[in-house]
Amino acid sequence: MENIRNFCIIAHIDHGKSTLADRLLEFTSTVSNRQMQAQVLDDMDLERERGITIKSHAIQMNYIYEGQKYVLNLIDTPGHVDFSYEVSRSIAACEGALLIVDAAQGIEAQTISNLYLALENDLEIIPVLNKIDLPGAMPEEVKDQVVELLGCDRDSIIPASGKEGIGIFEILAAIIQRIPPPKGDPKAPLQALIFDSQFNSFRGIEVMFRIFNGTIKKGDKVKFINIGKEYYADEIGVLKLQQEPQLEMSAGNVGYIISGIKEAKDVKVGDTITHVSRPGEPIQGFADVKPMVFAGIYPVETSEFEDLRAAMEKLQLNDASLVWEPETSIALGFGFRCGFLGMLHMEIVQERLEREFDMTVITTVPSVQFKAYLTKGNEMVVVNAPSDMPEPTTLDYIEEPYIKAQIITKADFVGPVISLCMDKRGIITNQTYLTSDRVELTFELPLAEIVFDFFDKLKTISKGYASLDYELIGFRESNVIKLDIMLNGEKVDALSAIVHRDKAYDWGKRLCEKLKDLIPMQMFEIAVQAAIGQKIIARETVKAMRKNVLAKCYGGDISRKRKLLEKQKKGKKRMRQVGNVEIPQAAFMAILKLDQ
């Protein structure tokens, strides 16, 4: 156990975590030259395409340092704010962390929030200055920022470059010297923390764990404490690039267990594995993840509902932060109400459903969770979808979630950033200059305002320099209302949205204009209306396709023409009473891009 080191890599997006991990694997000969490719650990196509890490990945390296053999367990973590839950799970399984800071970008919001996560868990932090080979690198200034943030020694910051392979040896030496070996007693009752799982269609569910106390042998009968189910450890082993089976593993190690589990709901991340014969106490796991954004996901063909359910269950194994429950919509039939961590997470889930499971899905307007208080008996209703909103007459008041957002940006862009946040109903609470050129702004904002396109806009106005991190600070009373969209007098529940009263008219008008362009012409005219309760606030008309019934009248009497036109009008009216309007997927997506 003395020679085991468990560590993870934390950094902001694009500061070079995955590239540095590649170099460490190459340097310790964990990966042969033949297997080497960029972002070795990012095994989803989606991750490679977007160049981001979505899942945490664990891998074991062997390294000989000063004549002794060490086992290093590396857990690579995502950097995006939507996936901070993945990071917190990885941190719980480690004793140390490499904090990577880009020498050209400096410290960003995500760096700080992940660092606080690591410090709360008493991890040993090794600061690494990455990308020092870039022409725009400012190693001395960034070192000052790191010293100020961590209060560490200037010399303890390791200059490195993942691309050029500079400083890799120093990093490995620091991991061995500075990170403490895992504590734990191999003879105590077994306690192993589950930090990830994935589905293998041949072998059932593979569970990744970190042993805190005790020893597990192949063939042992184990129990998952939270769920209370018992299994046999058919295969246990360590995670190299491929899995390597072992006969026994003891405290301090990170590995996987396969026991033919078929049911997705039997494995919960954060659960504890122990022996049936000699049970240990459950480990205090992580806080349950709280979804921030809710949206409906529906199959395009109603017959595919069961396939979609199976796909969602398999996806949940690998993505512990996805929450869902079945729901029905008048317009779209059966589907699921899903909770996501943010908009990027929602996009990724939708893309993974399409790629990995061949499901074409329709997503409805994303919304956040509101609390509606009724006038009768002080009752509280949780509103996750616009259709859950009680009638306006029964409402006393509504509360919406607020967040504290920390934005770090260059001094030149402070003005535009502040005005963007003011537009989004934000209040500025603090402004500090980290260096002469970098400012940290703290805002309190309604979560609903940043769900849509806040992040994109922030990047646009700051030329890509601003970085954002946010946390929930609770619910506050707010003047929000439900806006309905009606087509020919029928409400389309999937297009409803909950918006702030001040923005309702503008939103309704723009949405009607957008839908008018997107809904294909029918044989009858379609009235597109936006309504609050019974009051119509905007209307557009999609004109009908019509035949020129006067084509056969050359000259002729006006009354003859009028007769033909009246006849056509009656026919169109009859069609409108029985006709259904098909809403294209583009119409649902349009709502997300109303501002552009």
Curated annotation (Swiss-Prot):
A Pfam entry, by short name: EFG_C
Q: Which GO terms describe its cellular component?
A: plasma membrane
Tell me which CDD domains the record gives: EF4_II (cd03699), EF4_III (cd16260), LepA (cd01890), lepA_C (cd03709)
- One BP annotation, GO: positive regulation of translation
What is the annotated localization of this protein?
A: Cell inner membrane
Q: Keyword annotations for this protein?
A: Cell inner membrane, Cell membrane, GTP-binding, Hydrolase, Membrane, Nucleotide-binding, Protein biosynthesis
- TM ranges are none
UniProt protein name: Elongation factor 4
Species classification? Bacteria, Pseudomonadati, Bacteroidota, Cytophagia, Cytophagales
